[in-house]
Curated annotation (Swiss-Prot):
<keyword id="KW-0408">Iron</keyword>
<dbReference type="GO" id="GO:0005506">
    <property type="term" value="F:iron ion binding"/>
</dbReference>
<comment type="function">
    <text>Could be a mediator in iron transactions between iron acquisition and iron-requiring processes, such as synthesis and/or repair of Fe-S clusters in biosynthetic enzymes.</text>
</comment>
<dbReference type="GO" id="GO:0034599">
    <property type="term" value="P:cellular response to oxidative stress"/>
</dbReference>
<dbReference type="InterPro" id="IPR036766">
    <property type="entry name" value="Fe_traffick_prot_YggX_sf"/>
</dbReference>
<dbReference type="GO" id="GO:0005829">
    <property type="term" value="C:cytosol"/>
</dbReference>
<comment type="similarity">
    <text>Belongs to the Fe(2+)-trafficking protein family.</text>
</comment>
<protein>
    <recommendedName>
        <fullName>Probable Fe(2+)-trafficking protein</fullName>
    </recommendedName>
</protein>
<dbReference type="Pfam" id="PF04362">
    <property type="entry name" value="Iron_traffic"/>
</dbReference>
<dbReference type="InterPro" id="IPR007457">
    <property type="entry name" value="Fe_traffick_prot_YggX"/>
</dbReference>
Length: 93
């Protein structure tokens, strides 16, 4: 049976992650309070941040920036908007 969490991002109960996705206290908090769906949404946001800002993940400053954005995304006022990103128009719109 899937582990359920009260997802802080979705505002409802949803399937939880299988393991903490990040080390330390932040990873434990994400594991306890974030659903698989919300984590997948963050992974898409993180990918856009890396690509649009041309972040080099070998650079410690880039990794620290992403960690701050992840914390803001889940537990703060939201991650930085991706500059230049225009969401796709839904079909028939």
């Amino acid at each position: 049976m899937a582990r359920l969490v009260n997802c802080i991002k979705l505002g409802r109960e949803a399937e939880g992650l299988d393991f903490p996705p990040y080390p330390g206290a932040l990873g434990k908090r994400i594991w306890e309070e974030v659903s698989k769906q919300a984590w997948a949404d963050w992974m898409k946001q993180q990918t856009m941040l890396v690509n649009e800002n041309r972040l080099n993940l070998a650079d410690a400053r880039a990794r620290q920036y992403l960690a701050r954005q992840m914390e803001k995304h889940f537990f703060g006022d939201g991650a930085d908007a991706v500059q230049g990103y225009v969401p796709p128009t839904p079909p028939g719109a």
